């Protein structure tokens, strides 16, 4: 089989055919022809640039291009008309076409030889063809057929009929190989040339066979060549069609509009995908787990979960991801970039999904409701996590110690206890943290910002978690119950800490003195004893404290604030510990017993005072 040439993939239009096309079709023709030529050049097939391509690049009309001008091949020259002809065509047919094309707008009486040849013998190249043409014209002058639409003259009835078919738009010729129809035999022949060459190109990399356009695309995957460059931003592409799609980004044009919701898209494929959200259609199904998706790209991304593949690696810290979008979002942690800004409050975020979640704070919307207890949530993920409280599920297990967790985020945080790693450092004071969220919370200490306000009492907090914790005081809810002793807690973390009283577990150990604690907060507080650091200072009197909680309690001395009220008698206290002691008076309970005489007391301070009786007024040395 001969090699592919530009003539095999080029399509010729006459003036009347060209005028039947609308502007969009003409532009499509230009783009297709130019891309076909570029593809042939890339494959090393194309000869010197054909005149048709030069015309198209210059924006000229291609209809007046002669068929033989499509490629540069050695022509046969007619000495009389100096007309280039196809060598492979019959000269007889060629000469007739030359005469008819030259005089197509004249009457049939003008179809004769002009100056230059005294007789037929002098036109040696086309002698036979001329004789036949002359005979045809002289013997059948009454059978010259005229096209009423464009006044073209045809010397055969078949030619006239064939020409008229162009105006009717009928496509009588059908390709058996593909379901396509054509109105002209030449167009059908043209089409056949393309499909007969299918699989004639083989990839040297894998020996895979392709048709000519697929071969080009496949070849570019291996070479990495991207010849189609965007003049606007310099981005390069392997195919001209992809470049055309890309250009829409710069223009911002959105021609494809959803009739259902009015949303517009730059590409028709995006609109088709979008429509599935209204229809609920999910045609792309995962063979592994049966989960269905509305987009093929989402299915492809999903499949990496089963494969365990993580091809996208962060050059900064080495962390790997199964999606490029996740890597891009992760990189913002290192760069500090926050491109997604909330129009309501100006707060910026590293990714769009976090911004979307944040926006719910302003609307107060909670569309996701728990069927078990009726509690509502702003996000579906929060509802899913909440449901585990009722189910008691703990699907996430630590391979190091075997401990199980309800949430993957809690397991991730837990793992750092074993490694002792603290990758997140505060630029302000140099303090390091195990999680990014802990660093974010810490930074508020330096800024003093308090964005989260309680609608019930007006109190403001630096962190949303603190506000959530605070709200439980007003609600009086205690959802988390200890199965061992029945004691209930407002927060799951408090229940977990409480359980350690029964188990005696003390997982948090001080590296300095070896003392162990059941709570990480207690270990943190304890460590300050070794450093002697008192970083929390009272602005009123200058007194310094090791812990921020002590400073907060101390400030009440100056303000006179007593937020802790006894429900029994109405008496108020500055500190919760004092309120707890006070409540024992009403309960009549006496937890503190003197080992010397057996007397009971409801407060430890009363027992300490009592003991002085036995010691003779001397305070016991502990």
UniProtKB/Swiss-Prot annotation:
InterPro entries for this protein: GLI_C2H2-zinc-finger, KRAB, KRAB_dom_sf, Znf_C2H2_sf, Znf_C2H2_type
Signal sequence coordinates: none
PROSITE patterns xref list: KRAB, ZINC_FINGER_C2H2_1, ZINC_FINGER_C2H2_2
Residue ranges occupied by any KRAB domain in the UniProt entry: 4-75
Any one Gene Ontology molecular-function term assigned to this protein's record: DNA-binding transcription factor activity, RNA polymerase II-specific
Zinc finger (C2H2-type): 228-250, 256-278, 284-306, 312-334, 340-362, 368-390, 396-418, 424-446, 452-474, 480-502, 508-530, 536-558, 564-586, 592-614
Name of the protein this chain belongs to: Zinc finger protein 728
Keyword DNA-binding: no
One BP annotation, GO: positive regulation of transcription by RNA polymerase II
One CC-aspect GO term: nucleus
Alphabetical UniProt keywords: Metal-binding, Repeat, Zinc, Zinc-finger
């Amino acid at each position: 089989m001969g090699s592919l040439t530009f003539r095999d993939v080029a399509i010729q239009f006459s003036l009347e055919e060209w005028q039947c096309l609308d502007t969009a079709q003409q532009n499509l023709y230009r783009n297709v022809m130019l891309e076909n030529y570029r593809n042939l050049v890339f494959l090393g097939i194309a000869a010197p640039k054909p005149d048709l391509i030069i015309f198209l690049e210059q924006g000229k009309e291609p209809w007046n291009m002669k068929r033989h001008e499509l490629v540069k091949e050695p022509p046969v020259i007619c000495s009389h008309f100096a007309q280039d002809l196809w060598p492979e065509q019959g000269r007889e047919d060629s000469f007739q076409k030359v005469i008819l094309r030259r005089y197509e707008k004249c009457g049939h009486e003008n179809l004769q030889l002009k100056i230059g040849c005294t007789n037929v013998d002098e036109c040696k190249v086309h002698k036979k063809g001329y004789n036949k043409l002359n005979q045809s014209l002289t013997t059948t002058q009454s059978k010259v057929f005229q096209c009423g639409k464009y006044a073209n003259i045809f010397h055969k009835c078949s030619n006239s009929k064939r020409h008229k078919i162009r105006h009717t738009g009928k496509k009588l010729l059908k390709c058996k190989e593909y379901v396509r129809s054509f109105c002209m035999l030449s167009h059908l022949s043209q089409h056949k040339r393309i499909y007969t060459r299918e699989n004639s190109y083989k990839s040297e990399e894998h020996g895979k066979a392709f048709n000519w356009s697929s071969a080009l695309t496949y070849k570019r995957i291996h070479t990495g060549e991207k010849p189609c460059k965007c003049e606007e931003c310099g981005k390069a592409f392997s195919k001209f069609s992809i470049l055309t799609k890309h250009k829409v980004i710069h223009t911002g044009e959105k021609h494809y509009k959803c009739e259902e919701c009015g949303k517009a898209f730059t590409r028709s494929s995006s609109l088709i995908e979008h429509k599935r959200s209204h229809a609920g259609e999910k045609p792309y199904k995962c063979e592994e787990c049966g989960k269905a998706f509305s987009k093929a790209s989402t299915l492809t991304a999903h499949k990496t979960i089963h494969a365990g593949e993580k091809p996208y690696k962060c050059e900064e810290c080495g962390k790997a991801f199964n999606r490029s979008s996740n890597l891009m979002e992760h990189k913002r942690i290192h760069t500090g970039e926050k491109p997604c800004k909330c129009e309501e409050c100006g707060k910026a975020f590293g990714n769009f999904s976090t911004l979307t979640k944040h926006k719910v704070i302003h609307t107060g919307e909670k569309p996701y409701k728990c069927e078990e207890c009726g509690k509502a949530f702003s996000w579906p993920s929060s509802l899913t996590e909440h449901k585990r409280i009722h189910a008691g599920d703990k699907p996430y297990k630590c391979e190091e110690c075997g401990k199980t967790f309800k949430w993957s985020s809690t397991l991730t945080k837990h793992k750092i206890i074993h490694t002792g790693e603290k990758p997140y450092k505060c630029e302000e004071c140099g303090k390091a943290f195990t999680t990014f969220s802990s660093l974010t919370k810490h930074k508020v200490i330096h800024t003093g910002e308090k964005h989260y306000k309680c609608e019930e009492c007006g109190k403001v907090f630096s962190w949303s978690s603190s506000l959530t914790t605070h709200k439980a005081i007003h609600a009086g809810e205690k959802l988390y119950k200890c199965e061992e002793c029945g004691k209930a807690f407002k927060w799951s973390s408090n229940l977990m800490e409480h359980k350690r009283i029964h188990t005696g577990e003390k997982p948090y150990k001080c590296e300095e003195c070896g003392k162990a604690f059941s709570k990480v907060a207690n270990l943190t507080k304890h460590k300050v004893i070794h450093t002697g650091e008192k970083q929390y200072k009272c602005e009123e009197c200058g007194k310094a404290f090791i812990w921020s909680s002590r400073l907060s309690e101390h400030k009440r001395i100056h303000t006179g604030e007593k937020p802790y009220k006894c429900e029994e008698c109405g008496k108020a206290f500055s500190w919760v510990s004092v309120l707890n002691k006070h409540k024992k008076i009403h309960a009549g309970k006496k937890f503190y017993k003197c080992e010397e005489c057996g007397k009971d007391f409801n407060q430890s301070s009363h027992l300490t005072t009592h003991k002085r009786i036995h010691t003779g007024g001397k305070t016991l040395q502990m």
